[in-house]
A protein has these predicted regions:
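Sec-dependent N-terminal signal peptides
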Residues: 3-14
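Small/flexible residues
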Residues: 4, 133, 248-249
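Acidic, serine/threonine-rich low-complexity disordered tracts
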Residues: 17-105, 157-249
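Structured domain cores in non-transmembrane regions
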Residues: 64-65, 75-148
Length: 249
């Protein structure tokens, strides 16, 4: 669920070269459980979008105060973001994981490299003292995979690119979209415009349910007239209630 919530807090207007937004995440049974900062830089030739998210309260304890960072880096061509690299990082005490997607448009392939470092526990039995002696060591692993395909967007640029025209959609109109960076977006998601309400537009996103426990497979999100996310929501998550992300600044 963490990647979906992060995915749904990244819809911003491209009218400014630098933009910063703050969001909080809430679960109906626990209140505020997460926060995120979005920083968007675009000089007209290159862009860099960085999303930093972390849990608070009970979620912080459950995730060992883990911090998540998502980045999209690339070129700007005729006002359109063209991703070259997508990076997903996770940091916690004695833990680091960095997954980098490098897009080679010339050769129509994408290289996915993953680096992970974590502290693991090892125990040996001391037969003399009849006990287990526990030690810890840092273990590093590296993996690489090559996809024989490329995507127009990654899961961040998909919601930033103005040529996707979300605000121009009519009631009940749908868009099928795919993007690099997660199982949901690579296999394709369906965005549906539900209705306009005052100065806001309400949409739904059809998602996979493998990481939900009984929740709705449709998440909703609300954009204001500037194409900036106002709120997103997933209802009926077992044991947790409803998950809501709200803009606070």
């Amino acid at each position: 669920m963490k990647h979906l919530i992060i995915l749904m807090i990244i819809s911003l207007s491209l009218s400014a070269s630098t933009m910063k937004m703050d969001y909080v995440g809430e679960l109906s049974l626990f209140g505020e459980v997460a926060n995120a900062e979005v920083v968007y830089d675009n000089d007209g030739e290159k862009y860099h979008i960085k999303i930093t998210a972390s849990g608070s309260g009970i979620i912080a304890k459950l995730t060992n105060d883990k911090q998540y960072i998502l980045e999209s880096i690339g070129l700007v061509e005729d006002g359109v973001l063209v991703p070259q690299k997508h990076i997903r990082s996770e940091y916690a005490k004695d833990y680091k994981k960095i997954k980098t997607y490098t897009i080679d448009r010339e050769n129509n392939k994408t290289t996915i490299s993953e680096y992970k470092k974590e502290r693991v526990e090892e125990s040996t039995f001391d037969i003399i003292h009849v006990r287990y002696d526990v030690t810890y060591k840092d273990v590093e692993t590296k993996k690489e995979e090559v996809l024989d395909t490329i995507y127009k967007d990654d899961l961040i640029s998909m919601f930033f690119n103005k040529n996707n025209n979300f605000l121009a959609m009519k009631d009940n109109e749908t868009k099928y979209m795919s993007a690099l960076g997660s199982k949901d977006t690579q296999e394709g998601i369906v965005v549906k415009h539900i209705k306009h309400e005052d100065d806001k537009s309400i949409f739904s996103v059809n998602i996979e349910k493998d990481y939900l426990s009984g929740g709705s497979k449709d998440a909703t999100f609300v954009l204001d007239k500037e194409n900036i996310l106002y709120e997103s929501r997933i209802d009926g998550i077992l044991f947790f209630g409803n998950a809501i992300v709200r803009r606070v600044r």
